[in-house]
Amino acid sequence: MDFSKLPKILDEDKESTFGYVHGVSGPVVTACDMAGAAMYELVRVGHSELVGEIIRLEGDMATIQVYEETSGVSVGDPVLRTGKPLSVELGPGIMGAIFDGIQRPLSDISSQTQSIYIPRGVNVSALSRDIKWDFTPCKNLRVGSHITGGDIYGIVSENSLIKHKIMLPPRNRGTVTYIAPPGNYDTSDVVLELEFEGVKEKFTMVQVWPVRQVRPVTEKLPANHPLLTGQRVLDALFPCVQGGTTAIPGAFGCGKTVISQSLSKYSNSDVIIYVGCGERGNEMSEVLRDFPELTMEVDGKVESIMKRTALVANTSNMPVAAREASIYTGITLSEYFRDMGYHVSMMADSTSRWAEALREISGRLAEMPADSGYPAYLGARLASFYERAGRVKCLGNPEREGSVSIVGAVSPPGGDFSDPVTSATLGIVQVFWGLDKKLAQRKHFPSVNWLISYSKYMRALDEYYDKHFTEFVPLRTKAKEILQEEEDLAEIVQLVGKASLAETDKITLEVAKLIKDDFLQQNGYTPYDKFCPFYKTVGMLSNMIAFYDMARRAVETTAQSDNKITWSIIREHMGDILYKLSSMKFKDPLKDGEAKIKSDYAQLLEDMQNAFRSLED
């Protein structure tokens, strides 16, 4: 929001409007003489005018969580009420920007103050008022038209990837008395004027929305389109949908951040909101360094990924209270782009730090602690955040659909999934990508454990797969069966060794090894494997399962005859085929293209069939 427009303590004439600081405990300040204040109202605390939010009211005492460092605040300092809730500014200029937890633009603050830290009580507007945007009004809108909340009345080309649709705020309606002609305007210029019941109201390209309030929609729709991540293990075995909720719990060093970053780089979303909530500052600087260099191809043109990304950075050394706000800021920005009809992905890295901030503030308020010291309302807060995801029919005209998908990373201490934050999250989300420390230690990345992870969207996506990839669903079932069987056989192998297994079991073990090492494992730092399109995923899986079926059939049909085929014979004769199977992943989708990869995989299938025929003869 525009902090420069909030009232200042020096401008206030009457001292009776002030409250006064009564006590300070870290980020929590108590103030007296605050009768008439509202819950979640923004206040300015002390002579440095720190931004704070009221989180508890008792008589004329208010408890305030302050979003800045409170050293130097003393008892008796004035507290000024602003009469507004914590809100964000929504308008052109969000994409490619980096904000802190309460939507202060970090690059603007850095250029204005020449400091590497955010000074206290800094006043800047979230969206720059100096940049001119090229505004084009909608063709069918003229003076005298009636418009209502959510209607799109103009378009601004924010950059070559995002067409920013300018919408009427949800609660307004009326008859158009003025609409700006096409031209360049900044975000403080009036572009629309409405009249409703004799009252005229002017609108700029920016709307302000309270972060704790859900933006209204016409209706929620069932989600039925996959969120493709480019990671084979996730797309094939545990798919998520556009508008779904996902949790990625894992201990330190398991690759949570790499998965959430590759989601933001390569997923099929239109807009990415990346919230770094209480994680290391280096990770956010890595995102800032990598993303501008990363490109994607749109309609034959190469574009920077940063053009569709907004970052909310709230690293672990920033004030604790702002961590809680950063999650709400991120989800409100996501909902705004969803209302334009875009598919938005929001990455929250990590929700555990957010829960720890809740725990710290709850402890300072002397509330009753529940499990592990977290507050009793932890589950409710998590649910109210995750439930803002979904695929919806947007408010207003023209009719459009949008979605918000939330991917929350959870870092349980010591990788223990029975931790309260993880268990509360798993009760809410529909997809669980559990990361395994043992796999990470074996350098098997992405370290998603295929035995404990699950997705509840399988049924919802069956229709999509039947339409576009008919053979995929049985392949996935078969692959999961092979991996499960391999897990059961692993114990027997440890006891009696491989040699004493049945031939079919040996095949299961070898194919499971092939699937694990050459299908599920993926090197995110190579050009050919950093992103795997879905046709390549299906092609690879179908050849591996075809090999498994043919090998089993060859062994089973010749089991009774004299020249029976065993696994060792297959391996001897088919060294070349096995090598080709394990090197399917080296096909580069950008260099080779879809048609060549598909024909190569079809050729490999033909070679396999011929090899098994000659073996049986």
UniProtKB/Swiss-Prot annotation:
Belongs to the ATPase alpha/beta chains family. The lineage of its organism: Eukaryota, Metazoa, Chordata, Craniata, Vertebrata. This is V-type proton ATPase catalytic subunit A. GO terms for cellular component: apical plasma membrane; clathrin-coated vesicle membrane; cytoplasm; cytosol; lysosomal membrane; microvillus; nucleoplasm; plasma membrane. ATP binds at residues 250-257. It comes from Pongo abelii (Sumatran orangutan). GO terms for biological process: ATP metabolic process; cellular response to increased oxygen levels; intracellular iron ion homeostasis; synaptic vesicle lumen acidification. The gene is ATP6V1A. Catalytic subunit of the V1 complex of vacuolar(H+)-ATPase (V-ATPase), a multisubunit enzyme composed of a peripheral complex (V1) that hydrolyzes ATP and a membrane integral complex (V0) that translocates protons. V-ATPase is responsible for acidifying and maintaining the pH of intracellular compartments and in some cell types, is targeted to the plasma membrane, where it is responsible for acidifying the extracellular environment. It is a peripheral membrane protein. The modification Phosphothreonine is found at residue 136. The modification Phosphoserine is found at residue 384. Keywords: ATP-binding, Cytoplasm, Cytoplasmic vesicle, Hydrogen ion transport, Ion transport, Lysosome, Membrane, Nucleotide-binding, Phosphoprotein, Translocase, Transport.
